[in-house]
Every structure is written in structure tokens, then in C-alpha cells.
């Protein structure tokens, strides 16, 4: 968990001094990391810490559009950017927190079973393109 908290704090501090698109990208990545850390802590048995981190994640998700003054016509781009960045980073952040291999997928959820049918290089390819799209959307539309 320590491996992820330092970059998360770094993103928060640097994000406040950036242009709007870069700040939105950093905010989304930080929120995704927060959720992944919370899920990993919950699965490790640290329920109180996990609940606190999940509550913080919900607050950041709800407050994001107000912080960045997202207009109605920008809302879809904002949501899509978050979705693509979440697909790119969530599993990796979760796995780093739990000390698992970075491209590891479990076997319990439907998502895990579907992703396990894709070879590792295919998963890396999908997550890489998702990262490119997730970063490109705020740069183009904000």
C-alpha cells in the first residue's frame, strides 16, 4: 500500500498546479488508485480502513465535476475519460497493493473470467489503448 500512497499524494499536489486537462487526468487516476487501494484493503481484512477509503473515493467522484466546473456538454467526455482510465489502472493498482503480479486476474467475478480468456499480451494491449483514449479525451475536450 505504501507503494501507491506516495504517487497518489504526488499526483494530488502536482495536479493543483496543472492545466485543466492534466488536472482532470491526475484526479481520475488518483480516484481510481484510491478505490483500488480500498478494495485491496477490504480483501486483506482491514475493513475500517477500507470503508474510510471507499467513502473518500465516493466524495472525490461526486465532487470532481464541481471542482473542475464540468459543463453539461462536457459530462459525457468526463465520464468516459474516467471509465477508460479506471479500466487501465484499477487492476494494476489493486495488484500492487496486494503484492500480486501486475497483470494478475482472479477467478471469481465475471470480469475476471472474461479477462482470463484473453492472453496477457492482449490484456496489456487493451489496457494500453484504454490509457491512450482516457488521456486523450480530456486533452481534446477540456
Task: Write out the residue ranges for each language-model feature.
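Sec-dependent N-terminal signal peptides
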Residues: 3-14
Amino acid at each position: 500500500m505504501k507503494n501507491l500512497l506516495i504517487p497518489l499524494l504526488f499526483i494530488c499536489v502536482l495536479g493543483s498546479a496543472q492545466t485543466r486537462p492534466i488536472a482532470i487526468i491526475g484526479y481520475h487516476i488518483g480516484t481510481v488508485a484510491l478505490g483500488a487501494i480500498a478494495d485491496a484493503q477490504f480483501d486483506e481484512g482491514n475493513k475500517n480502513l477500507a470503508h474510510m477509503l471507499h467513502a473518500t473515493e465516493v466524495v472525490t467522484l461526486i465532487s470532481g465535476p464541481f471542482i473542475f466546473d464540468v459543463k453539461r456538454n462536457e459530462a459525457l467526455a468526463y465520464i468516459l475519460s474516467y471509465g477508460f482510465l479506471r479500466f487501465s489502472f484499477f487492476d494494476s493498482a489493486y495488484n500492487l497493493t496486494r503484492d500480486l503480479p501486475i497483470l494478475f486476474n482472479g477467478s471469481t467475478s465475471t470480469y475476471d473470467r472474461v479477462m482470463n480468456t484473453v492472453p496477457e499480451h492482449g490484456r496489456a494491449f487493451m489496457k494500453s489503448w484504454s490509457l491512450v483514449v482516457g488521456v486523450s479525451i480530456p486533452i481534446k475536450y477540456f
